[in-house]
């Protein structure tokens, strides 16, 4: 099953309720997650922190992060409540007999934070393995081989190696040059 933990739809009830709540705050008033727990589910800010931050609908005082697009707000995966939500998602699918997840956009959970992303992956993978010892996880980390190799610290058993199959990737280069040793050396980077 493909699991998109990085973001939700801008139409998701968590996001729409959080936006309605923020739009109703008075200028300078801080959000209270005991009043609206969903304000902690996303990366909201009272200032536009970069080009991936968009105005909260109905508010000129609040912004949210959407790394891929304004219609896909980023979830706050450091939030224990969000982590619990994904444990419930895992429970649902594992109880139905699913024995593996493809983790979408794993390197974007927290931007430029490999260690934090590895912790997030490890926590969910460990949870799933406790539910099903045969559980398998593969993570999408669309990056260089060196960055992908760093993500193995998460304990996740497999990462996609998109670069290996590109026109200039290790697989194509090995075939073009008749040099299988270069392919083996490229793959060994993941082992070490």
Where are these regions (language model features)?
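Active-site neighborhood of glycoside hydrolase catalytic domains
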Residues: 71-146
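Conserved alpha/beta catalytic core and glycan-binding cleft of carbohydrate-active enzymes
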Residues: 10-11, 16-23, 27-47, 125-126, ...
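Short secondary-structure capping/turn micro-motifs that flank functional sites
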Residues: 7-9, 109-110
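Asparagine-centered polar/low-complexity signal
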Residues: 6-7, 76, 161
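Active-site-adjacent "subsite" loops/lids of carbohydrate-active enzymes
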Residues: 11-96, 106
């Amino acid at each position: 099953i493909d699991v998109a933990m990085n973001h939700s739809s801008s139409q998701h009830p968590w996001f729409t309720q959080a936006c309605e709540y923020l739009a109703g705050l008075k200028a300078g008033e801080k959000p209270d997650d005991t009043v609206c727990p969903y304000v902690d589910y996303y990366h909201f800010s009272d200032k536009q922190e970069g080009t991936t931050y968009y105005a909260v609908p109905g508010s000129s005082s609040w912004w949210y992060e959407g790394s891929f697009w304004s219609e896909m707000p980023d979830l706050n995966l450091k939030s224990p409540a969000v982590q619990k939500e994904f444990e419930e998602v895992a429970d649902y699918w594992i109880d139905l007999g699913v024995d593996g997840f493809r983790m979408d956009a794993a390197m974007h959970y927290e931007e430029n934070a490999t260690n934090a992303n590895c912790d997030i992956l490890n926590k969910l993978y460990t949870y799933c393995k406790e539910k099903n010892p045969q559980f398998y996880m593969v993570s999408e980390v669309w990056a260089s081989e060196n960055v992908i190799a760093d993500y193995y610290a998460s304990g996740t058993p497999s990462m996609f190696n998109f670069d290996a199959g590109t026109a200039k990737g290790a697989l194509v280069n090995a075939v073009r040059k008749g040099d299988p040793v270069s392919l083996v050396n490229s793959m060994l980077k993941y082992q070490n």
